[in-house]
Amino acid sequence: TVITANQDILPRISSISHLGWYEKHFIPYDEEISIDTKEEAPKLIQSIHDKGTLAEWVKFIEPLFKSSIYLRLVVAACLASVLIEKCSALPFVLHLWGGSGAGKTVALKVAASVWGNPENYTQTINMTPNALMQIAGILHSLPLLGDELQTIKSNIAGQNYDKLIMQLTEG
């Protein structure tokens, strides 16, 4: 084949199937290793990038922090998620509960902005359990930020909701 005949001149690229920690590397911010699951979740993978400066981000969210406990909790959880593996801690789930207009979706979008484009990073949870597990597997160390949790309860008819949460946090 073409690849076999050209092994000496083709560049070798190390790749991995998930984001987050791999040994001492943190994907996608490591230049030595690339992610090879771009086809499974292209919008999600492309959403993870930097834009602007930390100072600009802090200036934008600081007023929101003062007025929303949801925002503070979700951003803290979002930042903590990448420390779980390094601290040998157990994964956790943060479920925001409140009426419409309480700021839950805004909090998710601001937390997603820690990692990149919040519109494409935040997931609708209106998907099959298998699709949700695939997204969680790709994110690995990064947080799974899902909106509209009530939509999944109707999609897992016959399946225990607690079992799904257990699968997400164990796998």
Pin down the residues of each PLM region.
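Conserved glycine-centered beta->alpha loop in an early N-terminal alpha/beta scaffold
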Residues: 1-65, 134, 139, 156
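Residue-identity detector for threonine
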Residues: 1-4, 37, 53, 105, ...
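A structural signal for alpha-helix termini and helix-coil/disorder junctions
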Residues: 2-5, 67, 85, 171
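Structured core elements
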Residues: 27, 95, 143-145
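P-loop NTPase catalytic core of nucleic-acid-dependent motor ATPases
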Residues: 33-120
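AAA+/P-loop NTPase substrate/partner-engagement loops
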Residues: 105-160
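Conserved catalytic/switch belt of AAA+ P-loop NTPases
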Residues: 161-171
